[in-house]
A protein has these predicted regions:
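An N-terminally biased module of ancient metal coordination in phosphate/nucleic-acid-related enzymes
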Residues: 1-74, 80-91, 289
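Active-site gating/metal-coordination segments in enzymes
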Residues: 75-183
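Hydrophobic faces of well-ordered beta-strands that scaffold small-molecule active sites
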Residues: 4-8, 70-73, 111-114, 138-140, ...
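Generic structural signal for hydrophobic
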Residues: 62-66, 130, 161, 194, ...
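Short, acidic/polar
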Residues: 54-63, 119-130, 218
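Short, flexible/disordered intra-domain loops and linkers
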Residues: 43-48, 80-92, 177-185, 209-217, ...
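Active-site environment of divalent metal-dependent phosphoester hydrolases
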Residues: 9-14, 78-81, 118-122, 145, ...
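H/E-rich (His + Asp/Glu) clusters that bind or coordinate divalent metals
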Residues: 200, 207-297
Length: 297
């Protein structure tokens, strides 16, 4: 059985010609700088035409040097308004579906996860197109992309995903790496309609908060997992200070234990220190784990 990292981000810039872009605000620059330093990249690399290739090659090297066989590489859709038009001033990043699909064709280590806003006028057509090209998963960030997944007009979109067996990886809980446009959509209850339609849904970050004042949606997630057998969670970024409280229920809850999948949230930097401080690993394990420099491992 292959070991898969279900939650790996691609980052690209407008200088590469791949159609990607990244917008770093002054408020978020320190966090982006930290992520780049962890990859041995200078902040200035974001402006270089070679950045996409540098980021791709580092990721491939990390995967190949790890116990992971492949990673789900996430596209990043634009932010859309409720009327289906692009919200041009919103969003921090864009990674086209075609770029992720192409990388997956070129490298066996990548599994393509596309991103389609269901409010797009061509959402159904784009979903068909991506499925034909080998999409293995769909990723969305409801609170960052302005997606009310419970809107009844999206039901045909969710039905098609259910019929074709395409799983949905949906951000749940707070978010501070990317711009949030509707904080209410961080609630896992936002995923009720796709669940009712039969979509296999993975609640990214297990509905944990990203900041000290974010609501704790873990109890909501557990309640929904009792109600829906097609709801899962992932471990992405649970080894950061603010989300680490979610580690214990993911490890110890009988309900969650069999329905939690692995995700690194690469390139978000994590540390085993938080599992140690939460009493989930001992000091010897922490000492051993902190020697691992490969973020995918």
């Amino acid at each position: 059985m292959n070991t898969i990292d279900m939650h790996v981000h691609m980052v690209g810039n407008a200088a590469s010609g791949h159609g990607c872009w990244v917008r770093v605000t002054a408020l978020k620059a320190p966090l982006y700088g930290l992520m780049l330093r962890k990859l041995n990249l200078e902040f200035s690399a974001l402006e270089k035409s070679s950045f996409d290739d540098l980021f791709r090659d580092r990721l491939l090297n990390f995967i190949r040097a790890s116990g992971i066989d492949a990673a789900c590489l996430l596209a990043q859709e634009a932010v859309y308004k409720d009327d289906g038009t692009v919200w041009k001033d919103a969003g921090n990043a864009f990674i086209p579906n075609d770029y992720v699909l192409g990388l997956a064709r070129d490298y066996k280590e990548f599994i393509p996860a596309v991103s389609i806003h269901p409010a797009r006028p061509d959402a159904i057509e784009e979903l068909h197109r991506c499925l034909e090209q080998g999409a293995a998963m769909m990723k969305c960030l409801p609170n960052c992309q302005n997606i009310n997944c419970n809107d009844s007009k999206f039901k045909p979109f969710w039905n098609l995903m259910a019929e074709t067996g395409l799983p949905l990886l949906a951000h749940t809980g707070g978010e501070h790496t990317l711009q949030v446009v509707n904080a209410d959509y961080a609630d896992p209850e936002t995923l009720r309609l796709p669940l009712e339609c039969g979509v296999n849904v993975i609640a990214a970050h297990a509905a944990t908060g990203s900041g000290p004042f974010d609501p704790d949606y873990v109890p909501t997630l557990i309640r929904l997992m009792r109600e829906f057998q097609n709801l899962y969670a992932d471990t992405s970024a649970l080894n950061v200070p603010t989300r680490s409280y979610g580690l214990r229920p993911c490890l110890e809850s009988e309900l969650l234990a069999g329905r939690v999948v692995h995700g690194s949230d690469y390139p978000v930097p994590t540390s085993p220190a938080w599992a140690w401080l939460r009493g989930l690993i001992d000091s010897d394990q922490w000492t051993s784990l902190k020697r691992i420099s490969n973020p995918i491992e």
